[in-house]
């Protein structure tokens, strides 16, 4: 995330969001490993200091984060990326959430942070059946 929670959405700028976030996590995971911390989860921060275009780029390029050899968490549930793109409200974003969960799983996500547990479980079960 660039900036602070108070100003992170005010014109976020990245030359290449995926590369910059990956470089950040390479440095942080190395620092943690050197300090003896091995159990880490990578949360690339969808929606935090990023535009809709940044979020879609991160989702498309999610697999590059596998090089960190850590579980990848995505938190796309009801995010503004969905309702801004579809012109709906957060409360109406369940279908969009499920689509982004599926794309995330296909691109390497291991953990979903969700609001709608039943629907997310169904998504993961179908994904697992597809992968079998």
What are these regions (language model features)?
Residues 1-34, 49-132:
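Active-site-adjacent loop and "lid" segments of alpha/beta metabolic enzymes
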């Amino acid at each position: 995330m660039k900036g602070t929670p108070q100003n992170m959405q005010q014109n976020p700028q990245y030359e290449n969001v995926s590369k910059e976030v990956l470089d950040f996590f390479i440095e942080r995971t190395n620092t943690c490993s050197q300090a003896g911390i091995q159990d880490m989860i990578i949360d690339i921060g969808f929606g935090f200091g990023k535009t809709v275009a940044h979020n879609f780029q991160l989702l498309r390029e999610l697999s590059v984060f596998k090089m960190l050899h850590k579980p990848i968490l995505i938190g796309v549930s009801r995010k503004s990326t969905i309702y801004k793109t579809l012109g709906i409200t957060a409360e109406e974003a369940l279908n969009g959430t499920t689509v982004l969960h599926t794309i995330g799983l296909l691109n390497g996500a291991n953990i979903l942070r969700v609001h709608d547990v039943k629907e997310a479980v169904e998504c993961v079960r179908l994904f697992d059946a597809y992968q079998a």
